[in-house]
Amino acid sequence: MEFVYFSNEFPKDDLHDIYRGLHNHSKHRDFPLLARFLNEATAAVKDEVRRLPTELKRLIPPFDNLLSWVENKELREGLLCGAIDGVLLIVAQVASYIGYVESHPEELRNMSEASLAGLGIGLLASTAISLSTEQADLPLAGADAVRLAFRMGVHVFGVSENLEARDLSEKPETWACVVHNVDPAVAQKELDAMQPAGEVPETGKVFISAISRTSVTVSAPPQKLKALLNKCEFFRKARYIELPVYGGLCHAPHIYSAQDTESIVRGASLNARRKGLEPVVPVYSTSSGQPYAAKTATELFECVVSELLRQAICWDKVIAGIVDSAKRTATTEATLHCFGNSIPLNDLDKAFKSDMPELRVSTNNLVPWIFQNEPRDTAPRGPAQSKLAITGISCRFPGGATTTEKFWEILEKGLDVSRKIPADRFDIETHYDPTGKALNKSMTQYMCPIDEPGLFDAPFFNMSPREAQVVDPQMRLALVTAYEALERAGYVGNRTASTKLERIGTYYGQAADDYREVNQGQEVSTYYIPGGCRAFGPGRINYFFKFAGPSYSIDTACSSGLAAIEIACRALWNGDVDTAVTGGMNILTNPDGFAGLNQGHFLSKGHNACKTWDATADGYCRADGIGSLVIKRLEDAEADNDNILGVILGAGTNHSAEAVSITHPHAGHQAYLSRQVLRQAGVDPLDVSYVELHGTGTQAGDFEEMSGIMDVYAPLTKRRSKDQPLHIGAVKSNVGHGESVAGTTALIKVLMMLQKNAIPKHIGIKTEINPKFPKDFKQRNLHIAFEQTAWPQIPGKKRLAAINNFGAAGGNTTMVLEEGPVREKQQADPRQSHVVAVSAKTKASLTGNIERLIAYLEANPATDLADLAYTSTARRYQHTHRVAMATSDVAELTKKLTSSLSKVDSIGPVGKSGPPQVAFSFTGQGASHKSMNLELYRDVPTFREHIHHLDTIAQNQGFPSCIPALDGSFPQDHEHSPVITQLALVCTEMALAKYWASLGVKPDVVIGHSLGEYAAMHVAGVITASDAIFMVGRRAQMLQEKCKIRSHTMMAVRASVAQISESSGGKRHTIACVNGPSDTVLSGTKEQMNEIQVPLEAAGYRCIKLDVAFAFHSEQTDPILDDLEAVLESGVVFQEPKMPYISPLLGKTIFDGKTLNANYVRRATREAVNFLPAMQNAIDIEAVSEETVWVEIGPHPVCAGFIKSIVPSTQLAIPSIRRNEDNWTTMSSSMAALHLTGVALSWNEFHRPFESSLRLLDLPTYAFTEKNYWLQYNGDWCLTKGNTFYSAEKEAARAAEPQPSVGSDLQTSTVQQVIALEVEGNAGVVVMKSDLMQGDLLVAAHGHRMNGCGVVTSSIHADIAYTLGNYLYRKIKPKDKVPAMNMTDLLVTKGLVAQNKTKYPQEFRVTAATPDITSGQIMMSWQNVDDNEPFATATLILGDANDWLSSWESMSHLICSRIDSLERMAAEGKASRFTRNMAYTLFASNLVDYADKYRGMQSVVMSGLEAFADVELTTKESGTWTIAPYFIDSVAHLAGFVMNCSDAMDAAKNYCVTPGWKSMRFAKPLTAGAKYRSYVRMIPTKDDPTVYLGDVYIMQDDEIMGMVGGIQFRSYPRILLNRFFSAPDKAMTEARAGNAATVTPQVTIPKPPSSLKTPAPANPSRRDSGVESKPLPPPQPKQAPPSTDSENSTISKALTLIATEGGLEISDLGDDVSFADLGIDSLLSLVISEKFRSELGVQVSGSLVLDYPRIGDMRRWLEEHY
């Protein structure tokens, strides 16, 4: 009999360990019922908690599983402790029972004769087994028991609370005591005497709740119970023990009624009731000792709950009842199942032995299996239960850590790699202020930078140089490290189920956009958005690798990297992806970040990384960093034969919600997260031997984190044993705080520690340890490694580590991982020869890859060659530049690799035009072995299985097995029957063809030689494999039956048919095969062959007799022909070939479905094999070519020689098998040769049969050909930003003051409304607003038309500046005369173009401000009303007009002499003279169409880029102006005329516009009707030939009266005219008008700086300013090499245009090169397409790169159409 006892006590084992073990087992596929029960039990309790009153609900914190209750001591000792422990006990017992049944499937199967019993709450657990008709019912019935236990516990608490309320500040007191060695009747009599009826309330009486022969349990409210025990002499003298009963009274009939039972059971939502479950196993009542008579689940539950509430326990009755039952059944064996040893079970065991001595009784504990059977290496239950394997890592970390090995060297040596901020980020000399008083400056000079972060291989990643320069370097390096991590992980797309492109996602952490904000922002270009916005980082990785899974960019501040990894883990656990590429990125270039973090007191000012845990820790040191990892589910990684660097067991993120501020850490929340992650991972915190801390080196952060870590991993309550030391470390002390990459850096550090079996020394403590830390490190067994410490592997146990990572925004992320599994090879790879391949995208990288591999082999001479071959072929991407070699020895390989270095320059790319054509040639019988011993048959299961399938077909058709001729069971010279020999040949060839197909080698055309035609017809789809076997077998049988074996023979002669005829001397013979120009086979009788051999050899022709049984293709076969044709006619169906079929019978290529038939086979048996004419025909009709790759299918290469003799220039002809050579030697050589031709081989399939014997090697990563692509941040504009004098304090104070009213005393044509004015002492600010669509201003704009649009000319800006400058000066100095004003440093970053629809306003505002008018400066800025970003800036410098005139006097003579010179040149015809109409007509046709009011130039003389003009200003001034724009333009736009109309400029392709000037000043007013003379000479700048500078001198009566100095023009491709000068549409206008009210102009009076100087314009556009600092400017295309394209051809021009736009060289534009390889994407394609149309007249769509993906495609299209 089976008896299961459910105790009312927890097992003696640690409850944490029990629950943790159950949790871990539930993750595995072998325990589905256990997992379901735990889920159902948790759901049931959550449902009950949800239903609780609010005051009780508050007592239970949120939980995700019941394991958290075990760890919550406060909860288990709280008010609801009875309910909590009741649930935990039932869950432990039912889960242990279910898990035991699942792990011991042979036990506890038949419970029909079993019995159940329990004590206390254990009785409720027994109902789960009783109600389970089948094991599948256990989870639901068990969840019901858990639900009722909770409900009953809550109910008991509610009742008991009314009897005696508990003081939570005190320890809980017991409600029950067991009194030993007393008679129950005497005990009851004593209780009655002490509690007379009517004198003591019934509800307060002490009562007996359990009875045994020698003891009683007495229960009562704690104080009543304590008082009686102390008061009553009887109980005081007896020995009593307090029981751990703290939840209230049970077994109390005077307290509870049937209504209580009904409330608990009937009010519950029960699965058993819903499913109609009934008791099937008897449960013994602890009051009657008999099984309950319940018929339904509800009745059983009510019986049990009623007994627990109202009936006293009498275990002796249970024992008697069970013994009686055993006696009645006459059982001979009894197994007592329990959950740990207990007194009641021992009593039952004694009773059995006493009353039934013949009964064999055994005890079985259902708990130990949890610990004895650690989770087996079985698949997890689902993705959510999987462990996650890290299979590849790569990094770019500070200190030159470009590899993980170099990173480890930094850690191992204990280096601090902080240094002065490098110049490629910003000029620290101008951006540093140790006092912190200077605006926007950093108080630290130090960081931990990556060396040369701009290094990048743009062509490899299909980026043009122009795009690469713009793309954020952290995105570029994320792409590079992702490639390296995948490469080290052995990733090849679609190789396995887990590497399907649709199932791979990317997840990267990034918290800053420095490069976009500062470097890119200086010149916004086509790639500004895709090159800088964060989403494009992971998106670019997906796009490059063609991953179709999700891509996420994660920003959680400093925890971004690890949070991204955690989200990647979630995706794997959720089943969203099968492989995740993840990590973090951070490249620092923006000085604002340093200034802001300094102001927030985050950064250390010293020259150190991070002083983590140091007493003087004062903040962190900022750091660069890029880290990438590849993560899979563990079972997938193991199935894929990956290297497993570490295994992630759990990860989670939460928020420090209760912290004192958002940036302040919180130890409690950190500890909570750690416990939660450990619980989910099923890990005991004390088993974790290393924790990598965040450790930024801030006082607050270090203390809070250390407190949380100690609380969880090294607590005082449950201390670590001596053999459980815990070490802690923090990588930031070495490489600084990488912010968004910090967690990634920490994870990679831990992975390297696992690999190196060492804990590197901690270098953060520079003085002494933080005094706030607890002093009991030693007692806690907690250690900081001050020297490198061994971290050895422990047999039978895995090392565990945790990583803490926090974010300044309040986020906490924690991860727990263990070391990867150790995998041993099952057996050695049997192959003797292997292929090692090295490839790259360029020759330079190929050289680098070869050199790296040579260095690796020299450093690792014991490298397993099989592993190397596997890694370099099946586990690496194969690029277009290749070397591959078959070898059997590493030393030999090293020599071959070294030799190949000298040949790299001669190696061209393969596969650029697609893979080569493949042809299969099938060998005839002349090459077959008598008895083959095929290693392929021995070693390749798929080949062997296919041979067996074919052999089965043959035997089913009545033929003998051909296996003995293949498997080596006979000596090679053993001669089999013709049937076996011929079947062996055809089966081998069909199996070889299928094997080649599995390797990716499939024929495009076939030819068969003699008997090889049957296999060829099968592969071509003409006949089935079954028919091929039938045809060959029947033909062989007929030959055997009707022809005499060995009476005839065949002889190969190295001569042509004509030569044989000429030299045979008339000897009789039959031409059997014409194989080549000098290869012929004769057939005949042996005598005939002997006779003809003599003259042929005498003539010098080599003759070889073939070892064949019959003379095929001769008269010997005549007897079988009729029968053969008849049999095939009726038994074989011939289909149309699926590929060209080269017929050696007909000497031509067959495409139709009629030629190949039974008659064809008859003729092919008898007639000659015309291999030579067949091949010649195939060449003639281009069915094959010299580029065709030939694979010979047969036991020995024969046809390959014929093919090469017919087509000597054949690229490749290789064998499958070679006689007397190991198959793998032949296959390796052939595979290597095929690989070098570009055939897409399935290397994975090639190695798959041996993968258990192979391991992935960590070979050197790809040798990128890197260049430095970097946009340098220039100047110090980050310090100014146009708000240099902004004062937050003043702004706040002024906001509370009444705003001054703005007077309306200023209104001109350009300054329509003053909207803000404030003056304070010598400081002031004025803001105006004007509508471009109004009045004279609109007329002025439309008088200056470009591209058909009205454009606000710079002269309008000048009038506004002079107007506001005069106005502001008068307001500040009303009594002073307004001085002359020099408008300096005008910079227009974006033209203001008038919209077409004038009914909508187009408003802009201009601000003029000065901190101190005595400084002589007024700052100007122009903005649209809906945008605070200025589109123009300038500075007015106050001056003296007389001083200007004096300074110009010396120049007047020089200018006049140049004008005289131009006059002479014009007179001599050496300079051009233009009239007014000619000049403005030309100006209008080239760029600017001026209205008549602007047309002041009356004549122009121009030579090259030098000119003068006679100017007369219009006599009518329409509008109100300070200086009319018509006047300014008339005297100044000579410079624009020169730049756009001079023959020295290419006006057809380009146009020139001015972004501004250095100065504009007029010493005298410009007067209507007055005459002036303007002179200018423009010169190109040295730094940028597209930028020109010049000075425009304005003269009156030979005296300089005005000057526009340093006027700048920049040349742009005319194709961009539409982009920059197009009227804004209505939608934009409406949006601007609608948003105008939301933007409030700042009118804060500027604060005077300590030293006033002309400020740099805010955020200048480098495109317009001409100020560029690019280490790698786009290269100009070099002269193309000699080609068939003439210089003036459309093709040549098109290539030049492409090279120019892509920043490429023409030599890069080979026909086989794709646009994608050049990095020309859709954006650049649009620009190129537009230029094709406008400059070349070539009409192409914007999808150029899609329509013509390769240069050659585009060239051919141009040749055809242009």
Swiss-Prot record:
The active site is at 558 (for beta-ketoacyl synthase activity), 694 (for beta-ketoacyl synthase activity), 737 (for beta-ketoacyl synthase activity), 1344 (proton acceptor), 1529 (proton donor). SUPFAM superfamilies: ACP-like (SSF47336), FabD/lysophospholipase-like (SSF52151), Probable ACP-binding domain of malonyl-CoA ACP transacylase (SSF55048), Thiolase-like (SSF53901). Residues 385-819 form the Ketosynthase family 3 (KS3) domain. Non-reducing polyketide synthase; part of the gene cluster that mediates the biosynthesis of an emodin derivative that may be involved in black Sigatoka disease of banana. The pathway begins with the synthesis of atrochrysone thioester by the polyketide synthase PKS8-1. The atrochrysone carboxyl ACP thioesterase MYCFIDRAFT_190111 then breaks the thioester bond and releases the atrochrysone carboxylic acid from PKS8-1. The lineage of its organism: Eukaryota, Fungi, Dikarya, Ascomycota, Pezizomycotina. It is an enzyme of class 2 (transferase). This is Non-reducing polyketide synthase PKS8-1. Keywords: Multifunctional enzyme, Phosphopantetheine, Phosphoprotein, Transferase. Residues 1685-1762 form the Carrier domain. Multidomain protein; including a starter unit:ACP transacylase (SAT) that selects the starter unit; a ketosynthase (KS) that catalyzes repeated decarboxylative condensation to elongate the polyketide backbone; a malonyl-CoA:ACP transacylase (MAT) that selects and transfers the extender unit malonyl-CoA; a product template (PT) domain that controls the immediate cyclization regioselectivity of the reactive polyketide backbone; and an acyl-carrier protein (ACP) that serves as the tether of the growing and completed polyketide via its phosphopantetheinyl arm. It comes from Pseudocercospora fijiensis (strain CIRAD86). Induction: Expression is positively regulated by the cluster-specific transcription factor MYCFIDRAFT_198930 and is up-regulated as early as 2 weeks post-inoculation and remains high through 9 weeks. Residues 1312-1448 are annotated as: N-terminal hotdog fold. Residues 1308-1622 are annotated as: Product template (PT) domain. Its EC number is 2.3.1.-. One of its GO terms (biological process) is secondary metabolite biosynthetic process. Gene3D superfamilies: 3.30.70.3290, 3.40.47.10, ACP-like (1.10.1200.10), Malonyl-Coenzyme A Acyl Carrier Protein, domain 2 (3.40.366.10), Polyketide synthase dehydratase (3.10.129.110). GO terms for molecular function: 3-oxoacyl-[acyl-carrier-protein] synthase activity; fatty acid synthase activity; phosphopantetheine binding.
